[in-house]
Curated annotation (Swiss-Prot):
This is E3 ubiquitin-protein ligase RNF186. Its EC number is 2.3.2.27. The RING-type domain is required for ubiquitination. The keyword tRNA processing does not apply.
Length: 226
């Protein structure tokens, strides 16, 4: 497997590197800069998938690019540096055996100072405080409405069952139909008293003054919201 011809890249990529100090790209005593946190070949930022690896010339590149540059020279695996063309031997062709660039890894290990954005905190606290009781009241009203709808649905099913019994019983037990009708009339009266004549319920058949006030108030609230 012959080495691929890699075009010589200009040395201006890292102006800190000198022939006497090729590790100047590490950022000096102040640590690596933002430009040193990405590979000079693929321009991808270093990460756990693309760890920075040092060649024999102390130039660092990501492990993915080094795997692509890996070739055989003199029956041995080696990688030519894209910057200075110096060949680095890789035992067994394993790029993971190369040394990591510790300064860059330490920089990546330190979490950045990020400010979490909370959109709910941008709103007016007074508005949120005033909106919480209203939301609680709306949820309670929705729960009551749901329960009332379920009760009405049950009453409709019971009435349907009563009608079926009235239609079937005269053909089966002609003498018992009188008592059954009396029982059904009593049950219907109880249901009517429960669902229509209770003064404390907002969803009853007889509207209370409070219910009328709420119904008159809803369109104005909708208009103010829109």
């Amino acid at each position: 497997m012959a080495c691929l011809e890699i075009p010589q890249q200009p040395q201006l990529v890292c102006q800190k590197a000198t022939p006497s100090d090729p590790a100047g790209c590490d950022g000096g005593p102040g640590g690596p800069t933002e430009g040193d946190l990405e590979c000079l070949v693929c321009r991808e930022p270093y990460s756990g998938v693309r760890p920075p690896k040092l060649l024999g010339c102390q130039h660092a590149f990501c492990a993915v690019c080094l795997k692509l540059l890996l070739c055989v020279q003199d029956d041995a695996w080696s990688i030519p540096c894209p910057l200075c063309r110096k060949v680095t031997a890789v035992p067994g062709g394993l790029v993971c055996t190369l040394r990591d660039q510790e300064k860059v890894l330490e920089r990546l290990a330190r979490p950045g100072l990020e400010v979490p954005l909370r959109p709910q905190g941008l709103a007016n606290p007074a508005t949120l405080t005033a909106g919480q009781p209203r939301e609680a009241g709306e949820e309670e009203q929705d729960a009551v409405t749901t329960n009332r709808a379920a009760a009405r649905r049950l009453a409709a099913h019971l009435l349907l069952l009563v009608l079926l019994i009235i239609l079937i019983l005269p053909f089966i037990y002609p003498g018992v139909i009188r008592w059954v009708l009396s029982f059904l009339e009593t049950l219907a009266l109880l249901l009517a008293l429960l669902f229509c004549s209770h003064p404390g319920q907002q969803d009853g058949c007889m509207p209370t003054p409070r219910t009328l006030f709420c119904r008159e108030r809803k369109p104005s609230e909708i208009a103010s919201i829109s």
